Swiss-Prot record:
Residues that bind ATP: 108-115
Organism of provenance: Rattus norvegicus (Rat)
One GO term of the biological process aspect: transferrin transport
GO cellular component terms, semicolon-separated: actin cytoskeleton; actin filament; apical part of cell; brush border; cell periphery; cytoplasm; early endosome; endosome membrane
Domain called TH1: residue spans: 952-1136
InterPro entries attached to this UniProt entry: IQ_motif_EF-hand-BS, Kinesin_motor_dom_sf, Myosin_head_motor_dom-like, Myosin_TH1, MYSc_Myo1, P-loop_NTPase
Keywords for this protein: Actin-binding, ATP-binding, Calmodulin-binding, Isopeptide bond, Motor protein, Myosin, Nucleotide-binding, Phosphoprotein, Repeat, Ubl conjugation
Cross-link (Glycyl lysine isopeptide (Lys-Gly) (interchain with G-Cter in SUMO1)): 287
Matching Gene3D superfamilies: 1.10.10.820, 1.20.5.190, 1.20.58.530, 6.20.240.20, Kinesin motor domain, Myosin VI head, motor domain, U50 subdomain
Phosphoserine modifications at: 60
Protein name: Unconventional myosin-Ib
Role summary: Motor protein that may participate in process critical to neuronal development and function such as cell migration, neurite outgrowth and vesicular transport.
Name of the gene encoding the protein in the UniProt record: Myo1b
Length: 1136
């Protein structure tokens, strides 16, 4: 028992003060400093009596392991260091053992860790309650309901990556043993305006991003969705990706959680179909169309999105399209139908999307309740966990912040009331004199908001219901008239003159002084958001849907049950929900967790004192401490108190044999503690001043040191004596054992020596006999060897003699043959010399005869005259040829192939050279006429000829078409100003192409832009850039050999641009686009771009390789090529 007490006391090894009730001195500075000191040492939990303060560490800490759960299980609240598990265990044991219904109220601003705190409470309760197959199933369903609700109800905000955008209260039901039976979840005020619009830097609800990131291609195709976030107007793009968040993995977690909770596969698919319909609603756009009566009527621009929504929801397209264009108003038995202008149509679209998602979320909560509710009807114990919005103060505060802060005011009110009530009940229960405590009661603020006569909500409802023109300005005027004199209401236009010159208070705003501080509310949107109107035509269109889930979400659309009453406003609904919640909480024993956000950067190890100070003030933590300390700062049961301090008194140490209260009285009397510093309750000792407790702790610490010294002294003496007696006994035993060992060793030595001597003698005799036998054997072997060597010597001598005889005979034959050969060669040489002399004489004689003849007949030759005649004739022929060529010259057109024929054969080479020189000359003359722009065009045409002539059937039709490049004139069209500003480089091509969808083969119009360094794709409607591909990442362009405009752009594997796969386009200017892409890539990368022309080639779509095959189309397909995705591996293009 002592060991356990020393190990686990709240006051031992304390960093700062674990319970701020004991903080001395108590002020705001010391309170914050205590929290910071504990935060820096990873002590994120601190007590205010039974209230737990939790500071968000923004990182994982090893303090929630199963071992920690066991440490806090069935332990006294103050027995261990502060922890959320201690409060959870206290609440669970009170529910199980004392049959008291519990509620755990978790409050704090957004990002303070409320959602995580609620998860920890539920996980602890699940870990410590009973086991069994049925119990485990209930626990698992309760825990897995959280991921489902977080996916549909949480979103990333600037303050919190997983901010709850709805309030959740869960009643967990237990049986008499403390085992969970089920639960009931209530949700409050889902922030449905986030569906259609999100502030900058924030995201829509998680489920939209999880669905697009984690769903399979088959599911996306079924839901008619694409993975590209930019395709949907309701999704913010600047924060689509969140660091450290894997939306794909979270989607799998949500699907698994839905299955565990009890959703069937058809139900889960129906939910995802509604989510997809909400996403696609945001893509519906309207255009004005004038009617004959002069009024503008809204018409849908592109009905493809509307068609897909109707296919998803099984709604008649005509009915839904009319609901977006007309509004029907019913009054008694009259119906009036009016057209909607474009602004009203957009309002109707957004209202439908918000209502569809909000009702889906409510249906999810009800469906989860059906699965987790208790199946038995026996009496149940209940533990409620409240996780609701924290107090919100933004730069722009609207109706949502007003409602949220109203809820927090009510929670603060019940916190003050229940805290004081609990404190008072404990004093009465312990029979301690009660001291009245003064505190700020925020009931006046709650009354300002909720008063049925002149409260802000009542006036807002009155303004929404009155006939005539109702605007936000008229509502503000009404507030200025009724609330002007209220001390917590401020307005620039009120009758109160002190705010007339307040420049911090705009004319279109009002300010309320909440318990957390002053909040400025923008009045814009209060009336619309409170009305929350959905046109009856849209409700009826939804009720007519063939989709069972959607039909069930809009029961008011049933024409047979038309209700002409105005539906309750959002404010009145929320007020009623809060009243029900407060009534529920007041029936339970409260447990509080106050969550604090240490910084706005969502970073670990950063503690912003100013931010924490602000939260401490509006949470009223110092006031809570003062309430706790108003009577007695510390209280403890008699048994643990006596167990902890009994060593301070000789009468109680080491064991007290009487009642624990008597022991504590003896102890305090012995220590001479003043009587006014403490009081004895029925089961507890109450200490008034923290200094008294710290004095007890100092005395206990000093006494523990003295006891430790005494224990060490006695232990060392006992250890030395024990060691001496052991050594003495050991000496006797060792001597006896040594004598035995010495005799035994001597005997063994003698015995082993005799054995060694015997072994040596036997060995010597054996070796002697062995030597004699070996000598005899060697003698016999030596005689045989000598005889063999002698016979071998005789044989080798005979062999050498025979070889010498044979060698002498061969040498004689060789010498004789060499001499005969030498003689023959000399004779041959003599005969050759004689023959050469005879031939030389004959040659000299012939030359001599020729010389004599030439000398005799030289006077008869006319060599000079013939040469001159030949040269003259040749010159005349050439002159005549050139004069004729001058008169017969062809035209200067480079394509003219005419050329005069040659008159003589010997002029053939000259004729051809002249033709070549003339053609080069006229080509140069032709080129000199062109400007640089014309030269570039002809170079591109020449490049196109080399790439596609006789290879692509489409090429001949492109020869006569000039290459323009900029078909869209982006610089002149104001629609594309944003696109023009986003591109700083020179635009080489600007053309509208059809981008082929990778999933279904359908085409989507895109703007194709080619610059010096990049290839870009932009949305044709908005001009927003969808994809940007550096030219260095383009590896190949593939196309067919037929007369079609399809081509594929292949991207480098592993590059960022290739994450979704290659692109497949269709264009009427294929030849021009491919040629310019080839030349630009060559200029940028110094490498030729591979142009593949084949009727069948492969493209990479994400992780799959898909074959693109060109086939001959049927006549019924018309004259336009069509593209169709056959399966995961084949995409066919039918070419007419």
């Amino acid at each position: 028992m002592a060991k356990k007490e020393v190990k686990s006391s709240l006051l031992d090894n304390m960093i700062g003060v674990g319970d701020t009730v004991l903080l001395e001195p108590l002020n705001e500075e010391t309170f914050i400093d205590n929290l910071k000191k504990r935060f820096d040492h990873n002590e994120i939990y601190t007590y205010i009596g039974s209230v737990v303060i939790s500071v968000n560490p923004y990182r994982s800490l090893p303090i929630y392991s199963p071992e920690k759960v066991e440490d806090y299980r069935n332990r006294n609240f103050y027995e261990l260091s502060p922890h959320i598990f201690a409060l959870s265990d206290e609440a669970y044991r009170s529910l199980r053992d004392q049959d008291k219904d519990q509620c755990i109220l978790i409050t704090g601003e957004s990002g303070a860790g409320k959602t995580e705190a609620s998860k920890l409470v539920m996980s602890y309760v699940a870990a410590v309650c009973g086991k069994g197959a049925e119990v485990n199933q209930v626990k698992e369903q309760l825990l897995q309901s959280t991921p489902v609700l977080e996916a549909f109800g949480n979103a990333k905000t600037v303050r919190n990556d997983n901010s709850s955008r709805f309030g959740k209260y869960m009643d967990i039901e237990f049986d008499f043993k403390g085992d969970p039976l089920g639960g009931v979840i209530s949700n409050y005020l889902l922030e449905k305006s986030r569906v259609v619009k999100q502030p900058r830097g924030e995201r829509n609800f998680h489920v939209f991003y999880q669905l697009l990131s984690g769903a399979s291609e088959e599911l996306l195709h079924k839901l008619k969705l694409e993975r590209d976030f930019s395709r949907y107007n309701y999704l913010s793009l600047d924060s689509a990706k969140v660091n450290g968040v894997d939306d794909a993995a979270n989607f799998r977690t949500v699907r698994n959680a839905m299955q565990i909770v009890g959703f069937s596969d058809p139900e889960a698919e129906s939910v995802l179909e509604v989510v997809a319909a909400v996403l696609k609603l945001g893509n519906i756009e309207f255009k004005p169309e004038s009617r004959m009566n002069g009024l503008d009527e809204s018409k849908i621009k592109d009905k493809n999105e509307l068609k897909e929504i109707c296919e998803l929801t099984s709604i008649d397209q005509v009915v839904l399209e009319r609901a977006f264009s007309f509004r029907t108003v019913e009054a008694k038995q009259e119906k009036v139908s009016t057209t909607l202008n474009v602004a009203q149509a957009y309002y109707a679209r957004d209202a439908l999307a918000k209502n569809l998602y909000s009702r889906l979320f409510s249906w999810l909560v009800n469906r989860i309740n059906e699965s987790i509710k208790a199946q038995t009807k026996v009496r149940k114990k209940v533990m409620g966990v409240l996780d609701i919005y924290g107090f919100e103060i933004f730069e722009d505060n609207s109706f949502e912040q007003f409602i949220i802060n109203y809820c927090n005011e009510k929670l603060q009110q019940i916190f003050i009331e229940l805290t004081l009530k609990e404190e008072q009940e404990e004093y009465i229960r312990e029979d301690i004199e009660w001291t009245h405590i003064d505190y700020f009661n925020n009931a006046i603020i709650c009354d300002l908001i909720e008063n049925n006569t002149n409260g802000i909500l009542a006036m807002l409802d009155e303004e929404c219901l009155r006939p005539g023109t109702v605007t936000d300005e008229t509502f503000l005027e009404k507030l200025n008239q009724v609330c002007a004199t209220h001390q917590h209401f401020e307005s620039r236009m009120s009758k109160c003159s002190r705010f007339l010159n307040d420049t911090t208070l705009p004319h279109s705003c009002f300010r309320i002084q909440h318990y957390a501080g002053k909040v400025l509310y923008q009045v814009e949107g209060f009336v619309d958001k409170n009305n929350d109107l959905l046109y009856r035509d849209l409700s009826q269109a939804m009720w007519k849907a063939g989709h069972a889930l959607i039909k069930s979400l809009f029961p008011e659309g049933n024409p047979a049950k038309v209700n002409l009453k105005r539906p309750p406003t959002a404010g009145s609904q929320f007020k009623a929900s809060v009243a029900t919640l407060m009534k529920n909480l007041q029936t339970k024993n409260p447990n509080y967790i106050r969550c604090i956000k240490p910084n706005d950067k969502k970073a670990a190890h950063i503690f912003s004192e100013s931010l924490v100070c602000h939260q401490i003030r509006y949470l009223g933590l110092l006031e809570n401490v003062r309430v706790r300390r108003a009577g007695y700062a510390f209280r403890q049961a008699y048994e643990p108190c006596l167990e902890r301090y009994k060593m301070l008194c000789k009468q109680t140490w080491p064991h007290w044999k009487g009642p624990a209260r008597s022991g504590v009285e003896v102890l305090f009397n012995e220590l001479e503690i003043p009587v006014e510093e403490y009081s004895f309750g029925r089961s507890k000792i109450f200490i008034r001043n923290p200094r008294t407790l710290f004095q007890l702790e100092d005395l206990r610490k000093q006494r523990l040191e003295d006891l430790a010294t005494l224990i060490q002294k006695i232990y060392r003496g006992w250890k030395c004596r024990t060691h001496f007696l052991l050594m003495k006994r050991s000496q006797v035993v060792i001597a006896a054992w040594y004598r035995r060992y010495a005799q035994q060793k001597r005997y063994q030595q003698i015995k082993s020596s005799a054995l060694v001597i015997q072994s040596y003698i036997r060995g010597w005799k054996a070796r002697k006999i062995l030597r004699e036998l070996k000598h005899q054997k060697r003698c016999k072997e030596a005689a045989t060897t000598i005889a063999a060597y002698w016979h071998g010597t005789q044989a080798r001598k005979e062999r050498r003699r025979l070889k010498d005889e044979a060698r002498n005979k061969h040498a004689i034959a060789v010498i004789w043959a060499f001499w005969l050969g030498s003689k023959a060669r000399r004779e041959l040489k003599r005969l050759k010399e004689e023959a050469r002399r005879k031939h030389a004489v004959a040659v000299i004689w012939a030359y001599w005869l020729g010389l004599k003849v030439r000398r005799e007949y030289r006077k008869f030759f006319r060599a000079n005259a013939g040469k001159k005649i030949y040269e003259f004739t040749l010159q005349r022929i050439v002159q005549k040829y050139l004069l004729e060529m001058k008169n017969k010259m062809p035209s200067l057109s480079p394509i003219d192939k005419n050329w005069p024929s040659r008159p003589y054969l010997f002029l053939d080479s000259t004729h051809k050279e002249l033709k070549r020189i003339f053609h080069l000359w006229r080509c140069k003359k032709y080129r000199d006429q062109f400007t640089d722009q014309q030269k570039l065009i002809y170079e591109e045409k020449l490049e196109a000829s080399e790439l596609f002539k006789d290879k692509k059937a489409l090429y001949p039709s492109s020869v006569g078409q000039p290459f323009q490049g900029a078909y869209l004139e982006i610089n002149k069209n104001p629609k594309y100003k944003k696109l023009k500003d986003a591109i700083e480089e020179k635009i080489i091509i600007a053309e509208v192409v059809n981008k082929i969808n990778r999933a279904n083969g359908k085409s989507t119009s895109r703007i194709f832009l080619l610059t010096n360094n990049n290839l870009l794709l932009a949305d044709q409607k908005s001009g927003q850039i969808k994809s940007e591909v550096p030219l260095v990442d383009v590896t190949k362009v593939s196309m067919s050999s037929q007369n079609d405009g399809f081509f594929a752009v292949h991207l480098k594997e592993g590059s960022e641009a290739a994450s979704k796969g290659d692109f497949l386009f269709s264009s009427d200017h294929l030849i021009e686009m491919a040629t310019k892409l080839y030349r630009t890539t060559l200029s940028q990368t110094k490498q030729k771009l591979n142009i593949e022309i084949s009727d069948e080639f492969l493209v990479q779509f994400r992780q799959d390789k898909v074959c693109v095959k060109f086939i001959q189309g049927n006549q019924k397909n018309g004259s336009v090529p069509t593209c169709k995705r056959k399966n995961n591996r084949l995409l066919e293009v039918a070419v007419p």
